[in-house]
Swiss-Prot record:
One Pfam family named in its UniProt record: MFS_1
Function: Probable transporter.
Domain of life the protein comes from: Eukaryota
Keyword Transmembrane (UniProt): yes
GO molecular function, one term: transmembrane transporter activity
The protein's name: Probable transporter mch1
Source organism per UniProt: Aspergillus fumigatus (strain ATCC MYA-4609 / CBS 101355 / FGSC A1100 / Af293)
């Protein structure tokens, strides 16, 4: 029993309630009729209201945070898609050098360059296009693609302007003209080649970093690379049908090289400015790649624990376990900081954190570059790429003169060549290489097994567990299973060219061009994809830039071999009064050498594949 000075708290039973009585009626009036119960009830209701208001505030905060997170995620997706679109557009313009064979023969007939001088111009462009790629890739990895895009626009504009006025100056002095010396044209095409690599690498690196870990990384890389091949096609058509000379009867003649170069100078300058603002790498994705790469190196044992990856705050905290505030309740000096001092301290810590992240990123990328260069399989891959792309570059650059060698010497001068127009062959090689790049990129995505050597175990296990039943049972094919047959198609094109058939049936040269376009496009699509799969995307610009140097040497070597054979055949009795060569000797031995080169490349790639399989690397 309760004492007289104690409040009686009645027991509540479900039978004490009816439908017409307030739930707190007895408590509000009190058992003895006083208002004490109401006071306690008021405080209790106030607490309930405060709790309810706090819950609403917390819920609103959670909702606002979710909305803000979704907004940021949507903004990043929009940025990623827009950057991809700008990257594809940049590649659609960057490959202007692939239309060199459209106006290369005019350097022979209009400017009276020798075949060696024409090849010197094309080789200078090839070397300047490929040799600086590691430097530009390094800048893309450590900074952003935007400065490279701006540089490409400026250099493109200056290079094509110089080439336009060098062509307009006319024939060489030794041919009775007042034209500028050939080295001026060489300088112009060195600038054009440099700008080509700038714009191409800025666009491809942006796409690789923004989509490098998705399940569609192959097609997202193949599309801009395919756009690079298509640029020569549409630009050659514009030159042939819009920027061409007109004969007296109103028919179309040769391309107006001066106007064509002016058009490219203005167009590519504007494209570089657009890329400056449009090529963006989503920072969150890049930070994720860096962190995952560090974790993978630590798990593999290649990266031992180092004080370099310990933030300075952790090192400083190791000097003392307890703070001064733990010794007593007296406020320490830290508690007396003003708001401005706290803000400065927070800014200093944030700056230190950003500096640590930057140093970590640079150290990791340099470390991965060393690992890449020490990998023997990389060298086999690069050797094969050298042996495949060198003949391909030489064929594309000399396509115009190869067509003329298949034309009978007694053929009417103004009649179309039975082997086809240079613009037609440029279009064929652009279309076939584009189809090959898109097909190999998409099919390799569909059939290639999932990579397990670059992801942390928990991420990859989650991906495997999320796969559906039909996907798990789908047959898998390595990307090398697409690369090797493509190389054999390429060798078949050279083998057909080296046979007597194209001389008897010049129309077969279209088949040769199509086969070479298929093999050449597949190599340029699959090799960067393989590099991103085997060595990751965090250092993709540098890694791909190192391998992308080798076509420069290949193009120079096979270009010199072709021009030497062409000139020897011309001097040996196969030349015509206009300086052009006709017959098998002009190109035959070169075509045989290209066939053998591609076969050796297949062997080198098989050796690289064996090395990856031995290490458990899924390609």
């Amino acid at each position: 029993m309760a004492g007289p000075d104690q409040h009686y708290e009645p027991a509540i039973d479900k039978r004490d309630f009816d439908d017409h009585r307030p739930l707190l009626h007895d408590i509000d009036t009190g058992i003895d009729g006083t208002g004490d119960g109401r006071l306690r009830s008021d405080s209790r209701l106030s607490a309930f209201r405060n709790l309810d208001g706090g819950s609403d505030g917390l819920l609103n905060d959670v909702v606002d945070e979710i909305v803000e997170r979704d907004r940021r995620k949507m903004a990043m997706e929009v940025m990623r898609v827009c950057s991809f679109a700008v990257g594809v557009i940049s590649c659609l313009g960057a490959g202007s050098i692939t239309a060199f064979s459209l106006y290369g023969p005019l350097f022979l007939t209009r400017l009276h360059y020798s075949q060696l001088q024409v090849n010197a111009v094309s080789i200078a462009a090839e070397i300047s296009m490929y040799l600086p790629v590691p430097l530009f890739g390094y800048l893309c990895d450590r900074y952003t693609p935007s400065p490279l895009a701006l540089l490409s626009g400026l250099v493109f504009g200056g290079g094509y302007l110089l080439a336009a006025f060098a062509y307009r100056s006319g024939p060489l002095p030794e041919a009775g003209g007042e034209g500028w010396p050939p080295w001026v044209m060489v300088v112009a095409f060195v600038a054009i080649g440099t700008a080509t690599s700038c714009m191409y690498l800025a666009a491809v690196t942006t796409c690789a970093k923004n989509f490098g870990r998705g399940k569609h990384k192959g097609i997202m890389l193949a599309v801009p690379i395919a756009g690079f091949g298509l640029s020569g096609m549409w630009q050659s058509q514009v030159a042939t049908y819009l920027l061409c000379e007109r004969r007296e009867d109103g028919s179309r003649g040769d391309v107006d090289v001066f106007r064509y170069f002016l058009f490219l100078a203005l167009f590519l300058f504007c494209l570089g400015v657009i890329g400056t603002f449009g090529l963006r790498i989503v920072d969150e994705e890049e930070d994720q790649y860096i962190d995952e790469a560090v974790e993978e190196l630590e798990r593999s044992g290649l990266l031992e624990e180092s004080e370099f990856f310990r933030p300075r705050s952790e090192v400083q905290a190791a000097y003392g376990t307890f703070s001064d505030a733990a010794d007593g309740d007296a406020p320490g000096p830290e508690l007396s900081l003003t708001l401005s001092e706290e803000e400065r301290e927070a800014a200093r810590l944030e700056k230190e954190r950003e500096e640590e992240e930057r140093r970590k990123k640079n150290w990791l990328l340099n470390f991965e570059t060393r690992l890449f260069l020490q990998d023997q399989t990389m060298w086999w891959l690069a050797v094969g790429f050298f042996l495949v792309t060198g003949p391909g570059e030489a064929y594309i650059n000399n396509l115009g003169t190869i067509i003329q060698t298949l034309t009978p010497e007694l053929h009417p001068p103004n009649a179309p060549s039975p082997a086809g127009l240079p613009s037609t062959h440029v279009t064929i090689i652009a279309l076939t290489s584009t189809i090959a790049r898109l097909l190999t990129g998409s099919l390799s995505d569909f059939f290639a097994p999932p990579a397990t050597h670059l992801f942390p175990a928990n991420i990859e296990s989650g991906r495997r567990s999320s796969q559906s039943g039909p996907t798990a049972k789908r047959p898998t094919l390595s990307r090398l299973a697409f690369l090797l047959p493509s190389a054999l198609l390429l060798s078949l094109g050279y083998l057909l060219l080296s046979s007597p058939l194209p001389l008897q049936h010049p129309g077969l040269s279209h088949v040769t061009t199509a086969l070479i376009g298929l093999g050449y496009g597949s190599a340029f699509s699959l090799v960067p994809i393989i590099i991103s799969v085997v060595w990751g995307v965090e250092n993709f610009g540098t890694n791909w830039g190192i391998v992308a140097m080798v076509p420069a040497a290949g193009a120079a070597m096979w270009g010199v071999i072709y021009s030497r054979g062409y000139q020897d055949a011309t001097d040996g009795g196969n030349g015509s009064p206009d300086g052009q060569c006709h017959g098998w000797r002009c190109y035959g031995f070169w075509a045989v050498g290209c066939t053998l080169s591609v076969w050796v490349a297949v062997v080198a790639w098989i050796l690289a594949w064996r090395g990856w399989r031995r290490r458990g690397v899924v390609v």
